[in-house]
Amino acid sequence: MVKAVAVLASSEGVKGTIFFSQEGDGPTSVTGSVSGLKPGLHGFHVHALGDTTNGCMSTGPHFNPTGKEHGAPQDENRHAGDLGNITAGADGVANVNVSDSQIPLTGAHSIIGRAVVVHADPDDLGKGGHELSKTTGNAGGRVACGIIGLQG
């Protein structure tokens, strides 16, 4: 079993810890929680770069090693890093529990060293008709991020 973790932080008081685990070539399990969010849906993605020198802005675009358009997690045509939305309750806490086969922790398309990003707004899953729908899901600003690091 391979395990990884990302500690999310921001200047806006949003914080959290996201855990990743993968057994063999199976899907990667993503669990954890994020607090300090406004209630509602927030885009949740793996971004290409593990660079936070300019905060979450320097994490680059969504992780997309196969050059596809943005989509929903269940879509065949999607960025590998498109994990859809997380939902924050009235207390501002979003619990994460996702399983995904396009974000491996080993191999050529490993997400180790990349970043997980929480967005200000809902991800329209590429179906919103906005000019940004097919690239970012029109999910708005980046309110928290963390670099995905290998765990022992």
Swiss-Prot record:
Lineage of the organism: Eukaryota, Viridiplantae, Streptophyta, Embryophyta, Tracheophyta
Sequence similarity: Belongs to the Cu-Zn superoxide dismutase family.
Catalytic reaction annotation: 2 superoxide + 2 H(+) = H2O2 + O2
Gene for this chain: SODCC2
Name the UniProt record assigns to this protein: Superoxide dismutase [Cu-Zn] 2
PANTHER family: SUPEROXIDE DISMUTASE CU-ZN -RELATED (PTHR10003)
Annotated binding of Zn(2+), by residue: 62, 70, 79, 82
Organism: Oryza sativa subsp. japonica (Rice)
Main location: cytoplasm
Function (record text): Destroys radicals which are normally produced within the cells and which are toxic to biological systems.
